[in-house]
Amino acid sequence: MNKKRILSGMRPTGKLHIGHYVGALENWISLQHEYDNFHLIADYHVLTTNLNSDSIYQDSIEMLIDWLAAGLDPKISPMFRQSQIKEHAELHLIFSMLATVNRLERNPTVKDQIRDLHIENVSYGHLGYPVLQAADILLYKGDLVPVGEDQVPHIEITREIARKFNNQYGEVFPEPEPKLTAFARLPGLDGDAKMSKSLGNTILLSDDAETIKTKLRKAVTDPLKVRKNDPGRPEVCLVFSYHKKFSPSEILEIETGCRSGALGCVDCKLKCTSNISSFIAPILEKRKYYEEHLDEVKDILTDGENRAQKVAKITIQEVRDKMRLG
């Protein structure tokens, strides 16, 4: 029996943070042996919000290094840049004929991005990036797509496009299902709902222990816990949300200590620093190896792109045949 196929992707914005790990990478790593996986470096998608392409290649390499250091296995799953597989653009063009402007304007994720990034004039590419995302997924006939709740509307658009193409031209594409990430996101160090490089509120997977300590020292905690012995409210404390992920075996002790006033914020942050640093340490070690062996990283990318290209060519020819385009 053939394994179901998964298409996962990230926009390359440089080095990854622990929010990327919790929200995506951890899930990808756990799925790589169970499914047939393809991992996409979505470099075209970067251009939807930033036209400056000077750093895209280097950011792609940095992200790939983090993928490898965190535990993705290139022997199992190809890793490749979207821009190097020309079939992405061709399928995107075809799919753009199947998606209406009204449907894209109703997409809540795009609405949120426009609001959060204060975008006044939305580009055609930004409005239509769920169509490009549909091409990314369906070019490899993805059955499942690991996403957070905020990306589910995009998967629904992908399903609609697959259905419309199949009805119009004949059966080619599956209708992919979202595979929700259990621990979808970590809040930023400033208390913002999302950890984001653009907001400067991250702990990187490449941060050393001292850097993590410095960053966590400034992290937002319960404003009512002014003195060490004041009882705290873990449910409103940012640091406690990190403990839930990185200190699972101590979580009851930490919660009890906070509520009773026995555990002060400084000690709580130091404990969190220690546990996050211990988690990151093996990733840092592997990252150092790949930084010193960049030719190996580039070879992994080339191999992944060659493997992805073979699959993409087969799919696009099938599409052309169904559409009688030759």
Task: Locate the predicted segments by residue.
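Internal, conserved structured core segments that host functional sites
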Residues: 108-112, 116-165, 169, 187-190
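Conserved nucleotide- and phosphate/pyrophosphate-binding catalytic cores
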Residues: 153, 159-326
